[in-house]
């Protein structure tokens, strides 16, 4: 990091005193009353050059090439952002006065829907502007992402982890912890103010090497909720290890814009496979905003203010947000509380204000958990608490001449503390346990079976990153090239206490059952500080230019990226090309590769312990009893764990007819080397014992022979793959002036063929052990191979009456298709393990065979999902502004309480629509 900072300073001073400025662009930024706007932000999109207006509203940008076309974006908090195309002429280019309009409901033509019109960094970028954000009462950024086409609208709630999936359809899970859901979410980068909010250092889980793998390794609650209502909840977890960043932690109040890249990201962005969400927050001088949102299940309060320190010391923008929400207001057992505060100091330096610097400090705290339910006989308590702190600095230096146009240095350090805790009462005659941590036969311990089982996972993730980026420009003939190149380094570690598990008081599921003496995977203490810090390095170069082909502009963004992740090097070519046939028709083509580094929890999951009881000679007196147990310690290395990979190709088009705007995108994305846990079944031969009880002394133990036992554990491998195809469509209509109403139609269709490379195992142990020595206990099936289809569409009407400062929005949403298909062969075993753990292959499966016929899986058991009909849902919102200072908004999800249901093939009831939820928001601008 030190070397990159020195390089930044060297480049900066090396260009001081260079050739005189030849081309200059200048303008004055004012409001509707002609008053100059100080601290307005100005950005040249192509060269990444920044400027800030002075007290007279003036800005100047030099070093632009003659006869080139650029776009200047001018923004000011509380005003509508303006984007102006400019053709640079030799000498001074004075744009005169640029008037920004105050952003309120009296403004004509405000954006209420996200747009996809080639204005972002990629062909398929979906832009969510501040205009839309202000009209969307949101508890978190997840509510704003409901604008993504072919995504089912989620009601405003903070009662479960919010992970984002892009361009994929998988068999739905109730927890969102399916292997493919986690892999897709983990591959989506959340970029805030130029920094990747990574989840690489998150290690909050039990040992994933235990039974059932990563998706079942989270701290979970018991059942909770009001009994007898049919809506009892179960197995909640607030952890989001192995997946993406929990979007609940990101408030929406101070966000200026969001760019959702579901396709091929620019080469600048690394450590991703499935897209990126680029968030820019408000910085600079602004009015005072006070917001209060009251919902049926939550209350939210927000305050923000940007004020000028002085013309010399710049401006500071400060914000704070508090949310208190419940799963059910009637019992308030399940609660989520969040407080976020941030401060951003912005200033420009130098005689010509060429250096712009933004320094940010953020702090957030989350209290998530379930209190003791009086109806729970186990007195279960669960909590998932955390705090996070980050400090970052973004510097941009604008050059007035020469090849280099801009250099930027981004630094960030983030640290947090995560606590996942659960406790429950255990009431049994006695328990068996061992604290041994080495492989071999050990004498275990008898202890009381009445205690409180406690599990605490303590994590302290640390993430730091440095990014150095350059933008340059040159011409080849009549073509202006804008070259961006740079490097980035990221560091992730976890200094938490780790899995502070006490084997003396094992929780349910990890203790040896005293009645059956069955084998189990047990738990031990694991210190997260033993995990070696993750260090990833990336380099990139990219060229952006426009060429004339047949007299029409061909816009090209082409680059290449190289990363070193977990010791593996990768090359990622990426390109976004679009051809402007006319002002009303444009076609696009994009192609690229992406790689996502494995996280610390996948690289260093910790040792797995498997216990096989060999003898339990117990007569009710500990001093006269003996417990022998075999402990197997497995140390996963995961040295060969490679970064996951995706390869995408995308076609896009935009058509404008009579003010109708149609955007269409089709894609094919192939994801390979997805990381998941794979079940390993091994056989080991161990001694058998008998014991003769001796009054007043330990039993006499004799070895009588040997027998095979099964050892079962999970390891991380690059096991997942998926092939995704689909299309997305967005259609915007012009406003019908007579009724002041416009319409928006969006939707799509996704198909995903997904599977794994490893065989799957299924336990079929009967209640009564048969005498047949070849009876199948564990079935072996071919690797997972399924297809899923998903289609969602919506029709939105927006009535905007500027004279009344009123907006009314109605959404009709339709679930068109939601289907999962598994191959017939996946239900037929290819082999099995018998009682002595001997593998027997099956060549011609016979369902009538008494030894293995019970291994056949029926379609009902596979729980294939198939939406039998179109399911509709309806949402409504209204917003009214008074004197441009007070705004009242009201919104309802599932406005008509439409609760259709259907019965699945397995006989379970499915309710696709959530219960109605409503809320009101009051905002004040001073």
What are these regions (language model features)?
Residues 439-553, 773-783, 809, 824-828, ...:
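Outer-membrane beta-barrel transmembrane domain signature of Gram-negative proteins
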Residues 41-43, 49-58, 109-138, 144, ...:
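N-terminal periplasmic "start-of-domain" segments of outer-membrane beta-barrel proteins
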Residues 549, 668-670, 689-826:
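Gram-negative outer-membrane beta-barrel transporters
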Residues 670-673, 677, 814-836, 848-856, ...:
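C-terminal beta-signal and adjacent terminal beta-strands/loops
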Residues 142-230:
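Extracytoplasmic beta-strand/coil segments of soluble accessory domains associated
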Residues 323-443, 455-461, 913-919:
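Flexible loop and strand-edge segments within Gram-negative outer membrane beta-barrel domains
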């Amino acid at each position: 990091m030190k070397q990159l900072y020195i390089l930044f300073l060297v480049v900066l001073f090396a260009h001081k005193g260079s050739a005189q400025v030849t081309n200059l662009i200048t303008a004055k930024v004012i409001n509707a009353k002609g008053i100059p706007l100080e601290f307005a932000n100005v950005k040249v999109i192509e060269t990444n050059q920044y400027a800030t207006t002075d007290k007279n509203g003036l800005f100047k940008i030099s070093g632009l090439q003659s006869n080139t076309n650029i776009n200047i974006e001018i923004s000011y908090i509380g005003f509508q952002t303006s984007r102006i195309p400019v053709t640079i002429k030799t000498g001074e280019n004075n744009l005169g006065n640029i008037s920004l309009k105050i952003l309120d409901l009296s403004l004509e033509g405000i954006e209420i829907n996200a747009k996809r019109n080639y204005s972002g960094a990629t062909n398929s970028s979906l832009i969510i502007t501040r205009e839309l954000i202000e009209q969307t009462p949101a508890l978190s950024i997840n509510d704003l992402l409901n604008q993504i086409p072919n995504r089912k609208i989620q009601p405003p709630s903070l009662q479960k982890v919010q992970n984002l999936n892009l361009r994929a359809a998988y068999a739905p899970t109730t927890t969102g912890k399916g292997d493919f859901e986690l892999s897709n979410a983990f591959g989506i980068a959340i970029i805030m103010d130029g920094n990747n909010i990574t989840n690489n250092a998150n290690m909050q889980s039990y040992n994933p090497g235990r039974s059932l793998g990563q998706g079942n390794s989270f701290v979970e609650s018991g059942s909770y909720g009001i009994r007898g209502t049919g809506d009892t909840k179960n197995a909640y977890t607030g952890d989001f290890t192995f997946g993406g960043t929990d979007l609940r932690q990101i408030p929406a109040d101070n966000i200026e814009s969001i760019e959702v890249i579901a396709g091929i990201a620019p080469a600048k962005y690394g450590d991703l496979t499935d897209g990126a969400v680029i968030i820019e927050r408000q910085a600079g001088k602004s009015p005072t905003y006070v917001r209060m949102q009251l919902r049926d299940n939550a209350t939210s309060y927000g305050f923000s203010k940007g004020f000028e320190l002085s013309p010399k010391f710049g401006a500071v923008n400060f914000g704070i947000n508090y949310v208190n929400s419940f799963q059910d207001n009637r019992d308030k057992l399940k609660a989520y509380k969040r407080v976020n505060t941030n401060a951003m100091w912005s200033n420009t330096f130098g005689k010509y204000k060429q250096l712009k610097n933004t320094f940010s400090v953020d702090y957030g705290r989350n209290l998530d958990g379930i209190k003791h339910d009086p109806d729970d006989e186990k007195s279960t308590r669960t909590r998932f608490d955390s705090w996070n702190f980050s400090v970052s600095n973004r510097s941009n230096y604008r050059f007035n001449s020469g090849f280099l146009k801009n250099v930027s240095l981004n630094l960030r350090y983030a640290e947090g503390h995560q606590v996942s805790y659960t406790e429950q009462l255990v009431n049994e005659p006695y328990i068996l346990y061992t604290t041994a941590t080495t492989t071999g036969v050990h004498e275990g311990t008898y202890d009381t079976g009445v205690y409180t089982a406690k599990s605490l996972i303590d994590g302290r993730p640390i993430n730091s990153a440095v990014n150095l980026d350059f933008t340059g420009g040159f011409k080849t003939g009549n073509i202006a090239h804008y070259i961006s190149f740079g490097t980035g380094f990221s560091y992730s570690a976890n200094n938490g206490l780790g899995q502070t598990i006490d084997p003396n008081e094992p929780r349910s599921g990890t203790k040896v059952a005293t009645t059956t003496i069955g084998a189990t995977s047990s738990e031990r203490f694991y210190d997260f500080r033993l995990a070696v810090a993750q260090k990833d390095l990336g380099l990139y170069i990219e060229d952006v230019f426009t060429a004339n082909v047949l007299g029409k502009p061909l816009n090209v963004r082409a680059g290449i990226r190289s990363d070193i992740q977990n010791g593996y090097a990768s090359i990622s070519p990426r390109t976004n090309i679009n051809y402007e046939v006319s002002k009303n028709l444009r076609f696009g083509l994009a192609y690229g590769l992406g790689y996502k580094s494995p996280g610390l929890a996948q690289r260093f999951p910790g040792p797995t312990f498997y216990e096989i009881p060999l003898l339990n000679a117990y007569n009710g007196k500990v001093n006269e009893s003996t417990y022998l147990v075999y402990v197997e310690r497995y140390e996963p290395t995961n040295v060969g764990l490679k970064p996951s990979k995706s390869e995408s190709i995308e076609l896009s088009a935009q058509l404008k007819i009579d003010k109708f705007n149609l955007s269409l995108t089709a894609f094919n994305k192939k994801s390979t080397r997805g990381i998941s846990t794979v079940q390993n079944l091994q056989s080991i031969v161990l001694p058998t014992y008998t014991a003769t009880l001796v009054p007043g002394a330990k039993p006499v133990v004799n070895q009588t022979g040997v027998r095979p036992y099964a050892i079962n554990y999970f390891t991380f491998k690059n096991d997942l793959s998926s092939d995704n195809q689909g299309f997305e469509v967005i259609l915007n209509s012009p406003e019908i002036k007579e009724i002041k109403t416009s319409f928006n139609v969006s939707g799509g269709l996704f198909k995903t063929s997904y599977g794994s490379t490893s065989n799957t195992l299924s336990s079929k142990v009967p209640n009564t052990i048969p005498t047949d020595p070849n009876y199948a206990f564990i079935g072996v099936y071919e690797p997972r191979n399924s297809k899923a289809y998903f289609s969602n569409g919506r029709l939105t009407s927006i009535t905007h009456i500027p004279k009344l400062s009123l907006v009314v929005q109605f959404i009709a949403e339709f679930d068109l298709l939601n289907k999962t298909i598994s191959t017939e062969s996946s239900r037929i075993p290819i082999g099995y393990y018998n009682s002595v753990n001997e593998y027997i292959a099956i060549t011609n499966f016979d369902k009538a065979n008494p030894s293995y016929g019970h291994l056949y899986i029926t379609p009902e058991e596979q729980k294939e999902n198939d939406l039998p009909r179109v399911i509709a849902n309806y949402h409504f919102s209204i917003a009214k502004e008074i004197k441009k200072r007070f705004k009242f908004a009201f919104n309802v999800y599932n406005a008509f309480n439409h609760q259709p249901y259907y019965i699945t093939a397995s006989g379970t009831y499915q309710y696709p629509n959530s219960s109605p939820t409503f809320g009101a928001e009051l905002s004040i601008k001073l």
